């Protein structure tokens, strides 16, 4: 078979799953994929690689490549490498990202750009898949187009000059030189989807509705409203293209427990883990606020954990105990929850390079695995739905699961699974005849990820302490009936601190006394650039509505101590644009901000209240932070463009961060007198110079 090298760089398992799908399909198309994690540099060598390269790369943090790609990126970023270092290399790259974030698919773009700078050329156009609208909209056609591109490459490599472009929309020359063009693939690929002929694909199963659902042919449909469990024409009568069945590879044996003690320390982590006590918890909002915001103080005095303002850290959290018990009960495993789970690879598996899941510790209990290791709230991927089909006995339920994982059912999958935040438990309750084995769940459920939080303190101000702030997340899951769920981590933390929670709406500068009993496990996050400038004379602008204010409290505490230590120092202006709903309900850190303002640490404080109506004949105040930024556009432009200032934005990526970005574009356009495109280029330059920094989340 014709061999190609297949590398993946994954953070939460998405890129790995897609690479494994490519690997499985390769055999059907007459290719052999040499599959490796990009971190396994001892198993491949790009310097001497002669086969074509396919790379699947996700994005994490603020546009960073995954942790698994850290070493690889560092090596290829070596500026001493010659420009023809990879001139022999031909590759195709699929980037994964979320367009709700500013640095969309940036992990893939970083690698893609650097490979080309070192002489590598495309044999297939780069794809950018968007998790905001559904990765499959790009992933599926990109994979479908990979096979003709590989065939074309192998034909041309026999004596002809390599051709770098594979899709009909691109010319070979432009795909080598025009990086911007590749960013349009996530739109173009939806057009390409119409060009690929799926009728002859061996890796799909075409199912006729009459054959699969013949027992329902005489049923009169009275309610034409579709749902998770029911479809309507034309989908209910369509022939379906469904994915190939993922090969099973785990063999599970349950053994009675020997009674050994388990703890969250057993949870696997690439970074060091510290168990630290909670020394204080304070409610920052009133009881009638729309969201409940808590401040938690951790005692890190007996650890080697260190941080600086602007850093983030991860909290290792468990799944909800009630959800774990409900899932075990539905799987008819509740009487075996304390049994040890022994895993090994099936001797006859067809999965290439199958390995045991690294996030499941050896010999731990079933209860521990479902509580600490598996993301049971994860939205099931189509491959998981396809696997569940074969363990569903009811023909109507089987057909519906087939529809949801099919190409024809993409809209229903988005509406009833992805957008409804459906999880495995929702599906199992909605499809009662589905009885999957434990091994299947361990194969498909991803690792329970630690949750990141911004440090909301300075170690100069609070020695031996670490503060963080969070809203208790609540959301409606609408998969079957409406269910109000709390965030996995914030719901757990709220329960954990309930007995020690101080109901004050303002956090105190004073320590509350002895460390309290509850402990949590935390780990440091990789270093980022969301830090105060090294030169304290540089003016800064901070934009942080809601809990986005967290890192800026650390900035201000740090600056206060620096000014105490250097009373004659030259310190730049500090602007803060803060926003909340109501002045009297959720004005976080009100007392602290007044303190910083009074003592000249904070030079300008601009607060927006989005839900407070004007009183009497008052003019309507700035409703959101971006409105306040616009009101002070002249000063903002002066700081950024004339005084070499920095701007930091922290908070919601979906709306706020984009609105702030748009406001900055308008300000620069107006104050400098340039077109919006030129203003956008100016902001892009600020980002490159690390003077426009973001710490945002969805």
UniProtKB/Swiss-Prot annotation:
Residues binding NADP(+), per UniProt: 291, 610-611, 624-626, 659
CDD domains attached to this UniProt entry: methionine_synthase_red
Residues binding FAD, per UniProt: 451-454, 487-490, 697
Expression across tissues: Found in all tissues tested, particularly abundant in skeletal muscle.
Key words of the record: Amino-acid biosynthesis, Cytoplasm, Disease variant, FAD, Flavoprotein, FMN, Methionine biosynthesis, NADP, Oxidoreductase, Phosphoprotein, S-adenosyl-L-methionine
Domain Flavodoxin-like as annotated: residue spans: 5-147
Sequence positions that bind FMN: 93-124
GO terms, molecular function: [methionine synthase] reductase (NADPH) activity; FAD binding; flavin adenine dinucleotide binding; FMN binding; molecular carrier activity; NADPH binding; NADPH-hemoprotein reductase activity; oxidoreductase activity, acting on metal ions, NAD or NADP as acceptor
Cellular component, GO, one term: intermediate filament cytoskeleton
Pfam short name (any one): Flavodoxin_1
Protein's UniProt name: Methionine synthase reductase
Protein species of origin: Homo sapiens
Gene: MTRR
């Amino acid at each position: 078979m014709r061999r190609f090298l297949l590398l993946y760089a994954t953070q939460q398992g998405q890129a790995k799953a897609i690479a494994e799908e490519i690997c499985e399909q390769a055999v059907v198309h007459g290719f052999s994929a040499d599959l490796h994690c990009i971190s396994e540099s001892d198993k491949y060598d790009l310097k001497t690689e002669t086969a074509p390269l396919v790379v699947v790369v996700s994005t994490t943090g603020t546009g960073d490549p995954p942790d698994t790609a850290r070493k690889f990126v560092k090596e290829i970023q070596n500026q001493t490498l010659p420009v023809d270092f990879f001139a022999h290399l031909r590759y195709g790259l699929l980037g994964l990202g979320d367009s709700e974030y500013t640095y969309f698919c940036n992990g893939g773009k970083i690698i893609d750009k650097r490979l080309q700078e070192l002489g590598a050329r495309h044999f297939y156009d780069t794809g950018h898949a968007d998790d905001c609208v559904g990765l499959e909209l790009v992933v599926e056609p990109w994979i479908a187009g990979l096979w003709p591109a590989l065939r074309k490459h192998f034909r041309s490599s026999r004596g002809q000059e390599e051709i770098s472009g594979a899709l009909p929309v691109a010319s070979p020359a432009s795909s080598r030189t025009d990086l911007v063009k590749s960013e349009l693939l996530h739109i173009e690929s939806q057009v390409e989807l119409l060009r690929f002929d799926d009728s002859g694909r061996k890796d799909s199963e075409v199912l006729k509705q009459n054959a699969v659902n013949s027992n329902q042919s005489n049923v009169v449909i009275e309610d034409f409203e579709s749902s998770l469990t029911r479809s309507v024409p034309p989908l209910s009568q369509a022939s379906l293209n469904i994915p190939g069945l993922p090969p099973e590879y785990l063999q599970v044996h349950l053994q009675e427990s020997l009674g050994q003690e388990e703890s969250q320390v057993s949870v696997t982590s690439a970074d060091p883990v510290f168990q630290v006590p909670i020394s204080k918890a304070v409610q920052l909002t009133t009881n009638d606020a729309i969201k409940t915001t808590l401040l938690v103080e951790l005692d890190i005095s007996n650890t080697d954990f260190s941080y600086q303002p602007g850093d983030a850290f991860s909290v290792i959290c468990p799944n909800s105990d009630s959800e774990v018990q409900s899932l075990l009960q539905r799987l008819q495993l509740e009487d075996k929850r304390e049994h040890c789970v022994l895993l090994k690879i099936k001797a006859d598996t067809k999965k290439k390079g199958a390995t045991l899941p690294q996030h499941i510790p050896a010999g731990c209990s079933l209860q521990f695995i479902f509580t600490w290791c598996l993301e049971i709230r994860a939205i099931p991927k189509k491959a998981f739905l396809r696997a569940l089909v074969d363990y569903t006995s009811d023909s109507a339920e089987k057909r519906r699961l087939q529809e949801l994982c099919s190409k024809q059912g993409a809209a229903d999958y988005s509406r009833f699974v992805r957008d409804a935040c459906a999880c495995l438990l929702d599906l199992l309750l909605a499809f009662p005849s589905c009885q999957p084995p434990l091994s299947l769940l361990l194969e498909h459920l991803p690792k329970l990820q630690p949750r990141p939080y911004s440090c909301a303190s300075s170690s100069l101000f609070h020695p031996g302490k670490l503060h963080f702030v969070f809203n208790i997340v609540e959301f409606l899951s609408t998969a079957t009936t409406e269910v109000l769920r709390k965030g996995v981590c914030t719901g757990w933390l709220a329960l954990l601190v309930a007995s020690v929670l101080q109901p004050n709406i303002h956090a105190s500068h004073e320590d509350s006394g002895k460390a309290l009993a509850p402990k949590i496990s935390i780990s440091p996050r990789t270093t980022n650039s969301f830090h105060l400038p090294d030169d304290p004379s540089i003016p800064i602008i901070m934009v942080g509505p809601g809990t986005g204010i967290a890192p800026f409290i650390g900035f201000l505490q740090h600056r206060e101590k620096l000014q105490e230590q250097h009373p004659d120092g030259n310190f730049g202006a500090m602007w803060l644009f803060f926003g909340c709903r109501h002045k009297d309900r959720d004005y976080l850190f009100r007392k602290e901000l007044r303190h910083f303002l009074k003592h000249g640490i904070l030079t300008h404080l601009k607060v927006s209240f989005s839900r407070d109506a004007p009183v009497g004949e008052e003019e309507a105040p700035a409703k959101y932070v971006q409105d306040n930024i616009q009101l002070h556009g002249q000063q903002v432009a002066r700081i950024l463009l004339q005084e070499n200032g920095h701007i930091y934005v922290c908070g919601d990526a979906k709306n706020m961060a984009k609105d702030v970005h748009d406001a900055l574009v308008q300000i620069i356009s107006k104050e400098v007198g340039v077109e919006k495109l030129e203003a956008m280029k100016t902001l892009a330059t600020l980002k490159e110079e690390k003077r426009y920094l973001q710490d945002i989340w969805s």
